[in-house]
Amino acid sequence: MKTQFTVALSMLAGVAVGAVAVQGLHAQAKPPIYLVTEISVTNPEAYGKEFAPKAQATIKAAGGKFVALGGAGGAGAKDIIAIEGTAPKRAVIQQWASMDALMAWYKSADYQAALKIGEKYATFRRYAIEGKE
């Protein structure tokens, strides 16, 4: 009887550990979110000095990662090649762990303060795309 109880308890513990492991694996399998921003800059010098460093600092602090930088100016920016239609002059692609993380950054007081500066020197078009698993 004691042996059967021990075996049953061991099996129950194994099922519980397995369920937790499966949930953990499922949580890790969430695809990233990509934020695409097309930028039309009207004052490149002020944009580069007053807005870009502040915005980049908020992105890094919130866990965002730059995947691609394209267009005129900017450190490390590459050319944007139009395949079909007209390419924007500048574009940035960021990677975020989740839509919640992206929106928390976007709505943060720090980024909104930086954005007010950026809107003096540029217009932005943004959209988020969920990555594939």
Located regions from the model:
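Bacterial Sec-dependent N-terminal signal peptides
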Residues: 1-8
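Short, exposed beta-strand-loop hairpins at the edges of beta-sheets
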Residues: 103-104, 113-118
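A general structural signal for well-ordered secondary-structure junctions
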Residues: 65, 111-112, 124
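Alpha-helix boundary/capping residues
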Residues: 54, 109-110, 118-121
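Short S/T/G/P-rich N-terminal loop/turn motif that feeds into the first structured element of a domain
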Residues: 4, 14, 18-107, 130-133
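C-terminal end-helix/capping segment
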Residues: 118-133
